[in-house]
């Protein structure tokens, strides 16, 4: 319930979600799907529907049919956030060419200072960094509890990957990645220990993750959104752009029934 009204939301605890559809979905079937959704919700006395669709580039075959069907059935854009997408080239050297000089320098500095990066399962150490960072920067707690995150890693060991930067044996930064499908990896949690800002640990960490992603045949790295309800965090957006990323929409549709 939101403001005493019932909502169908796909899903309120997830980054995004919509219909699970075949690659060759037709415009006719797209319209029918949305119409069936509306009929079902009305039959259950649901007041509102809210859907956050995956970015188009997650699809194997690009299509805006579902978006079109939503709009034709009087859904509206509740918000249009922007997520940062990096196309991964065939080699890490080719991908590195997209980096701006500041990020290249930061990577070299991290290596010179003795930073190392690796795939690991030390979720507790990462969570401590994440909690501290979110509290300092935003006064909030992580979406998942530590226990929930540990359980997710157990259930989906091939779909959730933690990469971390280490300095003198201590974890100083980490990124929890969700493997979305065969060609897309999404950064879900990004955090670092601010006491080690001078090492720029995230720069070398992302470089290492891109190298892993390329070797694993992924084609797109999604850094996640840098907007909150349409308001951009310019510093965060610039940080991602310096890796060669560009922005695409992550849309949320809504309708009142």
Where are these regions (language model features)?
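Residue-level detector of anion-binding/catalytic polar loops
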Residues: 47, 76, 116, 219, ...
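A conserved beta-strand-loop-helix scaffold within acyl/acetyltransferase catalytic domains
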Residues: 1-6, 53-196, 212, 229, ...
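Gly/Ser/Thr-rich helix-start
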Residues: 18, 140, 225
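A short, structural micro-pattern
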Residues: 13, 45, 78-80, 247
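Aromatic (often tryptophan-rich) hydrophobic motifs at membrane interfaces
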Residues: 11-14, 26-38, 150-257
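A gly/proline- and charged-residue-enriched helix-loop-helix capping module
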Residues: 11-60
